[in-house]
From Swiss-Prot:
It comes from the Bacteria. This is Acireductone dioxygenase. Its cofactor is Fe(2+); Ni(2+). Fe(2+) binds at H100, H102, E106, H145. Pathway: Amino-acid biosynthesis; L-methionine biosynthesis via salvage pathway; L-methionine from S-methyl-5-thio-alpha-D-ribose 1-phosphate: step 5/6. The record marks D105 as: May play a role in transmitting local conformational changes. Ni(2+) binds at H100, H102, E106, H145. Catalyzes 2 different reactions between oxygen and the acireductone 1,2-dihydroxy-3-keto-5-methylthiopentene (DHK-MTPene) depending upon the metal bound in the active site. Fe-containing acireductone dioxygenase (Fe-ARD) produces formate and 2-keto-4-methylthiobutyrate (KMTB), the alpha-ketoacid precursor of methionine in the methionine recycle pathway. Ni-containing acireductone dioxygenase (Ni-ARD) produces methylthiopropionate, carbon monoxide and formate, and does not lie on the methionine recycle pathway. Belongs to the acireductone dioxygenase (ARD) family. It holds the Pfam family ARD. The record marks R108 as: Important to generate the dianion.
Amino acid sequence: MATIRIHDEANTTIENQEEVASFLDSQEVIYEQWDITRLPEHLSEKYDLTEEEKQQILDTFETEIKDISTRRGYKAQDVISLSDSNPKLDELLENFKREHHHTDDEVRFIVSGHGIFVIQGQDGTFFDVRLNPGDLISVPENIRHYFTLQEDRKVVAVRIFVTTEGWVPIYEKDSVNQ
């Protein structure tokens, strides 16, 4: 279940799931919880995945992926896995931390591990969405944000796209608001 930390003077934290969902809805961020217990046990917390295992993850959540894709007009999906076993992890994380936006939604469903989306709210204040297995988030188009990992430095996520080509980040700044 996701938690929120607002980058305000009090570092306000929201942990109650109804309040998390309400806050994200007020920011026009889609947040859903999918039944992660459906994931086959041999894929839980596995970060070095074969193409067949990635397809098995997509097949497991096919109904949910089709549902949100129908509602939002998404056309493609894939599975990404990041962990310390990737020799380019630090380089990838540096690139991910560059604040950017897209001309379409950025959608992630966390399968294993953890991730953080840092999103600019409607009032200009940034907030963190700390995601756990079972959490789906859709950052709306043209909203400034970036993604990073939590302390465990590993995540498996389903990415869902509007086009079969995926999305292209548009960078506004080289510095990151943290």
